[in-house]
């Protein structure tokens, strides 16, 4: 059975690839992303050496989503009222949460903002899912486990 799937923070590397795959499998896919955390506008010139290349990659990503009929609404998922209205409008069967600060240097510079963008968005998503009895899939990274003693990390590696 095909599903209505909402990706929160879905314009990143993982999110846009996941959206394309889910759409190819026949699902109805919708993305919401603030486009303000990990995109080109959130970096200073000194943060990125190949700014034009990076901008091109992001623009190509957005064009690819559009070309494949994947709708994007620019919305900050920290805004509970606005994001709840959006969730109600799309009425997803499944919500996949990808919103986060994905760059370690940005996370370390501003842990408060990292918490706000990573967990306030998750809190709002979980609250909606609880009220509407929707499934949530939470994707994260190894950064949530802290620093590791070795360069290689496996499922058996002890967390810091």
Give the ranges of each region predicted by the language model:
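N-terminal Rossmann-like NAD(P)+-binding domain of SDR-like oxidoreductases, especially those catalyzing
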Residues: 1-160
């Amino acid at each position: 059975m095909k599903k209505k799937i909402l990706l929160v923070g879905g314009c990143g590397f993982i999110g846009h690839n996941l959206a394309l795959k889910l759409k190819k499998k026949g699902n109805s896919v919708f993305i919401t992303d603030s486009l303000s955390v990990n995109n080109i506008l959130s970096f200073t010139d000194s943060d990125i050496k190949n700014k034009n290349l990076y901008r091109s990659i992001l623009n190509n990503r957005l064009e690819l989503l559009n070309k494949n009929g994947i709708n994007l609404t620019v919305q900050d998922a920290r805004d509970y009222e606005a994001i709840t209205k959006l969730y109600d409008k799309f009425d997803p069967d499944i919500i996949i949460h990808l919103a986060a600060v994905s760059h370690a240097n940005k996370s370390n510079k501003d842990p408060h903002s990292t918490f706000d963008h990573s967990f306030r968005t998750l809190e709002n998503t979980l609250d909606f899912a609880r009220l509407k009895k929707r499934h949530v899939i939470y994707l994260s990274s190894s950064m949530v486990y802290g620093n590791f003693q070795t360069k290689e990390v496996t499922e058996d590696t002890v967390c810091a």
